[in-house]
Structures are given as structure tokens and as C-alpha cells.
């Protein structure tokens, strides 16, 4: 099974390194510098020291990847619509399975990644690849656990077999909505946890915040499903609890580090300046706005997410934010 990966950031490249040890992989990037760097030294600047196998070919033209039987989309969620439109314009075959490896909610429409793909590429089957997985550890082939969510059991089982690696425990799920909700929310909660840690409020407050975060995940998950139901296996599995713990406790998390810098700013902070200092996308920044608006649309209360939103977008004070986060 030929595999293409769209997005040569840290995460997309890490997946390419992992799969490329035994399979032929096509990695697409729109960035000429990234293209030349990987082709020249077989290494990404985002993952120094992690060699990219010769089984991985890098392409600049999106037309060069459309013949693969599986396409993994590892682009930022806010760029997903544009990439899907490019695939549509290239007449992507209807039998090509699309695996979404991006996390977030589109700001302009409040749609999940799967809903964006269904809108633009309605005939292509969809799966979700999510769980606790820092790109650098995946690239170094350290052990990790993930969820492959797909509503088609036959296709899902086939994709699990294709993506399975010796160092990966890959679980199957039918819950594509729950897995995506959990994946998006954990980045916002990681920012909140970073603010608490940066403000030196201690690990007790940190642990309490993570615990309260699960209630907000359940609330949005239930409202999005529409009938009030949730899958306990999703909530307590790698895609939710596992990813939440990892993202909210390690400074390897871009979102936690972002929040930490805000909380640790003794003389005030500038959100845009902190964002510009990073080399990678802080998905939780965009997702905070999406979640705030989606919660309003669904008429549910999410005080932690609202507090993070008001801090990032409405210049709420650290003091007012912390009063919510540790209440």
C-alpha cells in the first residue's frame, strides 16, 4: 500500500520517518527550503539528529502524491481546507483513504477536520490518527500508543495493519467525533496548565486543573454528538486521557510551553510576541477561539476554555484568568 503524507512539519516528518523504515512514503511540502533541506541532508531542521530514510521521497508538487492508496494529512487544521481543495482540484481518486493527523477546529466554520474533508472530498473514506505522541519521540522510534478511528470496520482494520509498527500500540475505534474533540481540546487545556505552572501555583493546582478539564471535554463531546452519549473508552483511552496527560505535563508540549511563558511573565506579556518566538504552530491558540464560539453555539458552559480565550483574545488579566483556572 503506497502512502503519501501531506505536511512536512515536525509531526508529518516524524510519521514519514516511522513508516519509512519499512515502506515507501511520499512526503509533500510546499516549502522549498524544507524540500531542499530534506533532500540534501536527509534530515529535517525540526527534528535534528533524526535521519529520514531513503524510502521517503519528498515532493513539492501536490500532483506527485495523488496516486498513493492512503493519504495522511498532517497540516495545521486552519490550513486543511486549502489542502483538501488542492487535492480536489487534482482529481484525487475516490478510493484513496484519507487519514487525518491534525488536531483542532476550523475557526471560520467551527468544523472538525473530518467535517472539512467530507465537505470537499465527500467520496473519500476518512480515518483519524490521534493520541499521545511527541514528534521527536516518534522520529526516534520510542514506544507510543495511538488510536485509529474509522467508521468503516473493514477499512479501519486494514489501516491499523498498515500503520502498525513494532514500537506502536495502535488501538481501533469507531468514535471519530469523540477522538477529534479530545484531540482539539487538550491543546487549550495545555495552555491553561502552562499558565498555572508558569505562575508558580504548584502541582496540586496543576493536577486539579487537569481533572476539571475532563469535565469540559465530556460536556463538548456530549453536545457535539447530540444525543448526550459519550464513549467511556474514548475518554479513558490514549486519544483523550493519554493525550491530555502528556500535553498538559511536559514542556516538550508547544502549547504548555506557550502558556508557561505567559504565566511566567513578571512584567506583563505580549501574546503575539510569544507566538512569533516559536518555530511551530501553537494549535491551541486558534482552537481556543473555535472552542469559545462552538460552546456558545451549542449553549454549554466551558469556564476553563472561556478563561483562556479571554486572556488570549480579549486581554483579560493573568489574575482574572487564574481565579477561574484554580477555582
Curated annotation (Swiss-Prot):
One of its GO terms (cellular component) is cytosol. It comes from Wolbachia pipientis wMel. Belongs to the NAD-dependent glycerol-3-phosphate dehydrogenase family. Catalyzes the reduction of the glycolytic intermediate dihydroxyacetone phosphate (DHAP) to sn-glycerol 3-phosphate (G3P), the key precursor for phospholipid synthesis. The lineage of its organism: Bacteria, Pseudomonadati, Pseudomonadota, Alphaproteobacteria, Rickettsiales. Sn-glycerol 3-phosphate binds at residues 103, 131, 133, 186, 243, 253-255. Coiled coil: none annotated. One of its GO terms (molecular function) is NAD binding. The active site is at residue 186. Pathway: Membrane lipid metabolism; glycerophospholipid metabolism. HAMAP family: NAD_Glyc3P_dehydrog. Keywords: Cytoplasm, Lipid biosynthesis, Lipid metabolism, NAD, NADP, Nucleotide-binding, Oxidoreductase, Phospholipid biosynthesis, Phospholipid metabolism. NADPH binds at residues 11, 30, 103, 135, 254, 281, 283. It catalyses: sn-glycerol 3-phosphate + NAD(+) = dihydroxyacetone phosphate + NADH + H(+); sn-glycerol 3-phosphate + NADP(+) = dihydroxyacetone phosphate + NADPH + H(+). The gene is gpsA. This is Glycerol-3-phosphate dehydrogenase [NAD(P)+]. Its main location: cytoplasm.
Amino acid at each position: 500500500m503506497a502512502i503519501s503524507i501531506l505536511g512536512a512539519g515536525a509531526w508529518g516528518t516524524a510519521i514519514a520517518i516511522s513508516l519509512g523504515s519499512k515502506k515507501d512514503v511520499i512526503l509533500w511540502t510546499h516549502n522549498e527550503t524544507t524540500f531542499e533541506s530534506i533532500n540534501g541532508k536527509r534530515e529535517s531542521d525540526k527534528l535534528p539528529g533524526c535521519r529520514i530514510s531513503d524510502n521517503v521521497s519528498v515532493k513539492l508538487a501536490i500532483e506527485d502524491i495523488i496516486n498513493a492508496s492512503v493519504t495522511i494529512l498532517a497540516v495545521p487544521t486552519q490550513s486543511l481546507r486549502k489542502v483538501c481543495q488542492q487535492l480536489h482540484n487534482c482529481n484525487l481518486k475516490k478510493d484513496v483513504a484519507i487519514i487525518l493527523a491534525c488536531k483542532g477546529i476550523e475557526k471560520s466554520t467551527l468544523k472538525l477536520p473530518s467535517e472539512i474533508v467530507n465537505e470537499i472530498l465527500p467520496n473519500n473514506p476518512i480515518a483519524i490518527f490521534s493520541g499521545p505522541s511527541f514528534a521527536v519521540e516518534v522520529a526516534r522510534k520510542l514506544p507510543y500508543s495511538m488510536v485509529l478511528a474509522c467508521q468503516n470496520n473493514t477499512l479501519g482494520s486494514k489501516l491499523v495493519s498498515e500503520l502498525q509498527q513494532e514500537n506502536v500500540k495502535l488501538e481501533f475505534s469507531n468514535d471519530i467525533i469523540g477522538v477529534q474533540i479530545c484531540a482539539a481540546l487538550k491543546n487549550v487545556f495545555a495552555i491553561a496548565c502552562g499558565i498555572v505552572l508558569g505562575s508558580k501555583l504548584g502541582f496540586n493546582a496543576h493536577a486539579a486543573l487537569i481533572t476539571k478539564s475532563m469535565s469540559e471535554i465530556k460536556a463538548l463531546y456530549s453536545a457535539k454528538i447530540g444525543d448526550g452519549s459519550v464513549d467511556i473508552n474514548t475518554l479513558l483511552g490514549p486519544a483523550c486521557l493519554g493525550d491530555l496527560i502528556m500535553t498538559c505535563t511536559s514542556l516538550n508540549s508547544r502549547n504548555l510551553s506557550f502558556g508557561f511563558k505567559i504565566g511566567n511573565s513578571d512584567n506583563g506579556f505580549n501574546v503575539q510576541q510569544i507566538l512569533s518566538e516559536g518555530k511551530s504552530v501553537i494549535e491551541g491558540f486558534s482552537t481556543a477561539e473555535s472552542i469559545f464560539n462552538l460552546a456558545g453555539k451549542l449553549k454549554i458552559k466551558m469556564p476553563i476554555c472561556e478563561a483562556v480565550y479571554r486572556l488570549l483574545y480579549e486581554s483579560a488579566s493573568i489574575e482574572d484568568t487564574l481565579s477561574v483556572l484554580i477555582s
